[in-house]
Swiss-Prot record:
Main location: other
Function: Confers stability, involved in shaping gas vesicles, hollow, gas filled proteinaceous nanostructures. During planktonic growth they allow positioning of the organism at a favorable depth for light or nutrient acquisition.
Species this protein is from: Planktothrix agardhii (Oscillatoria agardhii)
Similarity comment text for this entry: Belongs to the gas vesicle GvpC family.
Annotated segments matching region Disordered: 1-20
Name of protein: Gas vesicle protein C
Top-level taxon: Bacteria
Gene: gvpC
Subcellular location: Gas vesicle
GO biological process entries: gas vesicle organization
Region listing for 5 X 33 AA tandem repeats, in residue ranges: 18-207
Segments annotated as Sequence repeats: 18-50, 51-83, 84-116, 117-149, 150-207
Comp. bias regions, Basic and acidic residues: 1-13
UniProt keywords, alphabetically: Gas vesicle, Repeat
A Gene Ontology term for the protein's cellular component: gas vesicle
Amino acid sequence: MALKDKWQQDRIGRQQGVQERQQQVQTTLSLWQQERQNQALDDQESRQGFVTGVQQQTQELLTNISTERLWVAQQQREQLENFIQQLSQEVGEFLQQTIEERSQVAAQLHQQLSEFREDLEYRVTDLLANYQKQRLEARETLLEDLAIFRQTLYREVEEYLGELDILHQQMAAQLQQQLQQSRTERKDAVQKLFEDLGVFRAELQDYHLKLQQTVWGSSHRKPRKAITPQRSIPSRLYSC
């Protein structure tokens, strides 16, 4: 075989070897690209499944928190209504008892005044009878005794009326103090309830924000906090 033919044959063999290696490289690259595409699809499906699971768990957690918050609010509202009802009942019973005591005092006073008037009429009648009998004998002495009796009677009546006025003022002051104390205690209880609700709302918002940061990370835009207007305590709860 001539040298040229041999060189030509070797050249063709080298070209075929190069083509085979190029084909192998192309096949290997195609396989790698297909594997990378499949892996990317698998990773995308895994991420989508993870995000869907996290969203579902977050929604369930928020639903449970909302349900629990509504239940707690319902329980606290029932407790507050029971407290107000019990306090109103106690105040009504106290007022009824005070009215009955005042009625008893008035009845006793009326009876005492009636007895005093009867006794006074009797004493005046007896005094007038004695006065008519002893008029000529002891006019000056009788008039002096009558003046002393009148002064004593006036003083006793004034003292008795003063005692009644003091008793009435003491009862009114005691009733006012008890009503003021009940109103203050009820106000403190309602204020404490709303403060607890405010703390619970702040803790819930903080927990929700931390949960969003945990799920979405710090790269996502943080949601704006909902501004809840401060609720004022109804004045009707303080004025019973």
